[in-house]
């Protein structure tokens, strides 16, 4: 019996009459996740776990009985989407309370992910929404079979194309949202190109993408050649990647840079070149590794801005763009009809990323996960 850690990809949001009570955030500036400037003086109303209305304070009245939260002096954003975590390294409730409402786990034992997934799927769960890759596909003796951070069962060694395709089928049956492969020639053998190609083919047959942990430029080129569509990190190669490779990566892959865990000059410059060539970037932190906090990682965002993303685009990479990349319809926006995944912070994060650490309110599907106490109480019924 294969442990199932994600029963199904969450579909488009729909109001749940038995869900959380109506909620209204009044008077906040709203960054809606689309990459534009915040809209000042807005009221956002959510009911049944879905955003119902977003409008100017004077023309948007909270419904009777709604819990009203004071948004004065604050910015309301979509809850963050972290595309690279190892969730079991921290209490999920702590991650959620820090403003991260959706995560994608990129490598952990199936049995432990099954327990995390069951908790995350419960209504009102004190956990981010969880998508997962499951085990990391590698070769015998390859990364991360001997990595000190990886519990037994994190790696899925395969020997040959047939065994690789069977591993993909098993991971897909368990509910994998993506297939992760390890190509780290700095620490051991790596998947040969024919085996890697078999993994990509088997994943595509099941509607899944492939993300790669790559150590060097050579492994990035190998991944690119067989159709891997995502880098789970920017390569750790201390040498600059050749220009033709950066050009090709910018054309063909999405990068989850994870710069905070290793902000070496070569990696920072590489992401800067990738962005300058129009490469697509999605926010991910490698939570569980050294550096990233169990919350919004403002240092990762700062490094993305340093790499050339305007602040609004960096925030979009952590909200709407990340959600779209993960296939989550109706997530990562503060607009009518979207999931009520909300993050209210003191100040303006576009002017000062540190504002993202000053959390006033977090909701996931409309359920309150963190509240600093600036609450106006329930709106009285209209006579």
Predicted regions, residues:
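N-terminal metal-binding scaffold of metallo-dependent hydrolase/deaminase domains
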Residues: 1-63, 347-352, 367-368
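Divalent metal-coordination and catalytic microenvironments
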Residues: 28, 44, 49, 73, ...
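Divalent-metal coordination cores built from histidine and acidic residues
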Residues: 74-76, 92-184, 188-208, 244-245, ...
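Active-site beta-loop-alpha junctions enriched in small/polar residues
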Residues: 86, 108-109, 135-137, 184-186, ...
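Glycine-enriched alpha-helix->loop->beta-strand junction motifs that scaffold or abut catalytic
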Residues: 224-231, 250-254, 278-280
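His/Asp/Glu-enriched, well-ordered alpha-helical/loop segment
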Residues: 267-348
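C-terminal cap of metal-dependent C-N hydrolases
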Residues: 318, 336-380
């Amino acid at each position: 019996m294969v442990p199932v850690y994600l029963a199904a990809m969450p579909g488009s949001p729909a109001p749940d009459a038995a869900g959380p009570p109506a909620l209204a955030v009044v008077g906040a500036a709203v960054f809606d996740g689309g990459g534009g400037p915040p809209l000042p003086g807005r009221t956002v109303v959510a009911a049944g776990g879905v955003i119902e209305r977003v409008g100017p304070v004077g023309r948007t009245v909270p419904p009777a009985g709604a819990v009203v939260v004071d948004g004065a002096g604050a910015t309301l954003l979509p809850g963050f989407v972290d595309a690279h975590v190892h969730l079991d390294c921290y209490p999920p409730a702590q991650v959620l309370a820090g403003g991260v409402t959706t995560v994608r786990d990129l490598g952990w034992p199936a049995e432990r992910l099954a327990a995390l997934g069951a908790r995350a799927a419960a209504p009102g769960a004190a956990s981010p929404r969880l998508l997962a890759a499951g085990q990391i596909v590698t070769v015998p003796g390859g990364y991360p079979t001997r990595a000190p951070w990886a519990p037994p069962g994190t790696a899925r060694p395969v020997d040959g194309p047939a065994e690789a395709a069977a591993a993909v089928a098993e991971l897909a049956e368990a509910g994998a949202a993506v297939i992760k492969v390890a190509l780290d020639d700095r620490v051991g053998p790596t998947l040969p190109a024919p085996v890697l190609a078999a993994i990509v083919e088997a994943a595509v047959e099941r509607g899944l993408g492939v993300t790669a942990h790559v150590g060097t430029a050579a492994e990035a080129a190998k991944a690119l050649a067989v159709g891997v569509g995502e880098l789970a990190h920017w390569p750790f190669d201390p040498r600059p990647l050749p220009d033709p490779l950066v050009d090709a990566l910018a054309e063909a892959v999405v990068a989850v840079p994870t710069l905070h865990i290793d902000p070496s000059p070569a990696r920072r410059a590489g992401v800067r070149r990738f962005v300058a060539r129009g490469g697509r970037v999605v926010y991910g932190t490698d939570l569980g590794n050294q550096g990233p906090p169990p919350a919004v990682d403002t240092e990762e965002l700062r490094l993305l801005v340093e790499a050339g993303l305007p602040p609004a685009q960096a925030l979009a990479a952590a909200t709407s763009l990340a959600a779209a990349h993960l296939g989550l319809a109706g997530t990562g926006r503060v607009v009518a009809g979207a999931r009520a995944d909300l993050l209210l912070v003191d100040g303006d994060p576009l002017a000062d990323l540190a504002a993202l650490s000053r959390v006033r309110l977090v909701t996931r599907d409309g359920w309150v996960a963190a509240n600093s106490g600036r609450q106006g109480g329930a709106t009285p019924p209209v006579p």
